[in-house]
Regions:
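Short, structured secondary-structure elements
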Residues: 1-114, 121-129, 133-171
Length: 171
């Protein structure tokens, strides 16, 4: 019902994304983005990056990405910290390192606050705001590319859920 009503009300896309991820938003739907199994935090972070940033980070949950040097495990774990209530431990080949990665956004933006919220709900609210921030270089590109593909048959970059700085636009 939430998504249907949001479209019916002509709700802005960035507002819908904020409502989807931020538990403090007035129309917050069920938090289906956050999965319930033991790897919920890493899957939630990877899924959010893929859907809203066109960035596949699943590999970086366990190791540095093999063919995309842009995504290190450390960078992914910093992003995933927003889906937890604490900084996450860096795990190497399933071995604990006792090294915790500070929570941080995946892109440098002038508007990123330097403090990190302490509770999971506050962190979810922060990641929602960072995703839709006008200074975020990927958010608008991602939805435009998805719509371009939907209506014109091919995205400006392909595949639509794996934008890479080292891959030129398809046309």
């Amino acid at each position: 019902d939430w998504i249907y009503n949001s479209f019916k009300e002509n709700k802005a896309y960035d507002v819908m994304v904020a409502e989807l991820l931020d538990p403090h938003m007035p129309d917050h739907p069920l938090r289906f983005v956050l999965r319930q199994d033991h790897t919920r935090i890493l899957k939630s972070a990877a899924d959010t990056a893929q859907v809203f940033l066109a960035t596949q980070m699943k590999c970086a949950a366990c190791h540095n990405h093999f063919d995309n040097k842009e995504w290190s495990q450390r960078r992914f774990m910093g992003f995933a910290g927003y889906f937890s209530d604490k900084d996450l431990e860096l795990i190497k080949c399933e071995a604990r390192t006792n090294e915790f990665v500070p929570t941080g956004f995946v892109f440098d933006m002038p508007s990123i606050p330097t403090d990190v919220p302490q509770t999971e709900d506050e962190r979810a609210a922060r990641i929602a705001q960072l995703l839709i921030d006008p200074c975020n270089p990927r958010f608008a590109k991602t939805i435009v590319n998805r719509l371009w593909k939907r209506f014109l048959g091919m995205g400006l970059f392909e595949p639509v859920d794996n934008f890479r700085e080292d891959t030129p636009a398809s046309h």
